[in-house]
Amino acid sequence: CNGLFLYTPPDKFPKLRTVQLTSAGLDRVPMDYMDAHGIKVFNARGVYSAPMAEFAVCSVLGFYKRSAFFSAAQSEHRWEKHRGLEELGGKRVVIVGAGSVGRACADRFRAFGCEIIGVDRRTAVDGFDKIYSIGDIRAAVSAGDIVIFCLPLTKETEHIANAELLCAMKD
């Protein structure tokens, strides 16, 4: 179930007792209703950790290696060199959310020689060179070269990546 309750209210299912989501976030489920009616909701935490982490690496590599530029040049039969491409080694990657997706990202970026900084509610999480508490997110983000948000969408996380926080990033 993912999005069913956007179109059909849960009271249309009078025998509903359990919901299994295909996502980690609960943003598409009326949790107040579920809690009030004793309906158990299970998410798919961890199921997409590897593909999400690989997508994050792909996106960062695409940015640093200017993949869109070279793809466009290739389609125009232009074989340009670009000597200003940066490498990931030595970059400081800030991963906001040290759950299964965040830890999978940390593992993959570490393979490129990156320093891995985490931001999480828990301040003791394996796989990170340093962990900041969620209250110190601005300090963590301002120290990073790359910032990746690995949080399920919930009431608590919905507006965490706002303009003020993103403006705190390094140039």
At which residue positions do the language-model features occur?
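An N-terminal-biased, well-structured beta-alpha scaffold segment characteristic
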Residues: 1-40, 167
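Glycine-rich Rossmann-fold phosphate-binding loop(s) that bind the pyrophosphate
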Residues: 98-99
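N-terminal Rossmann-fold NAD(P) dinucleotide-binding loop
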Residues: 102-103
